[in-house]
Amino acid sequence: MKQPNKAPRANIAAPKGTATPKRRRKTRDELDAEARDRKRQKKHSGNRSGARTNVEGSNKKGHSQTQEKDPRVGSKVPVPLVIESQVKAKSMPKPVEKNVVKPRLTPEEELAKLENDERLDALLDRLDNDEVLNKEDQAYVDLTLDRIDALMEQLGIELGDDEDDVEREEKQEDILQLLKRGNPKDTF
């Protein structure tokens, strides 16, 4: 036996006069119709028939009225079937320059060039004025002076320390004079 439907009760917690609208339950027929519609929509979720082969009708509806290129068609540039004697000069890449060997200077020329180097002169003047050079300048001075020494040795030129030579000669003269005179204490 079926029991009779109960009468809806009012919401006890809500104040009177603010009743919520009553929801109407859907009938079985309405539920079945909605289910059929959902199933129909789900069934047709893919591309329409022929979408893969008919490129014209694909996703670009109404964007432009001009006829768009078919992506399946390749280039329309004619391919020459016979090799002609005159071929268009294609832009040749610039030839890579080989390491150009600079003409070597003779040792005399290189030595003269290094001795007349303005940068070296300026740096040596700064060193004479007791200035401290940075690493790059100091390395340049050291390398250049080492090269000058090597070239002078190669050419057989001795470093002219005139002061040392003069002092040696004076000492020899002094010794000879002392020997000729006798005892140096006697002269005073």
From Swiss-Prot:
Asked if Oxidoreductase is a keyword of the record, the answer is: no
- Presence of keyword Chloroplast: no
Which residue stretches belong to region Disordered?
Answer: 1-80, 162-188
Which terms are listed as keywords in the entry?
GTPase activation, Ribosome biogenesis
Q: Where is the composition biased (Basic and acidic residues)?
A: 27-37
Query: Where does the record place a coiled coil?
Result: none
Q: Which processes are annotated in GO (biological process)?
A: ribosome biogenesis
Which Pfam family, an example, fits this chain? YihI
Q: Please give the superkingdom of this protein's source.
A: Bacteria
Q: Give GO terms: molecular function aspect only.
A: GTPase activator activity
Polar residues compositional bias, start-end: 47-57
Which InterPro entries does the record cross-reference, listed alphabetically? Answer: YihI
What does the similarity note say?
Belongs to the YihI family.
Subunit notes for this chain? Interacts with Der.
Function (record text): A GTPase-activating protein (GAP) that modifies Der/EngA GTPase function. May play a role in ribosome biogenesis.
Query: What is the official name of this protein in its record?
Result: Der GTPase-activating protein YihI
**What's the source species' lineage?**
Bacteria, Pseudomonadati, Pseudomonadota, Gammaproteobacteria, Enterobacterales
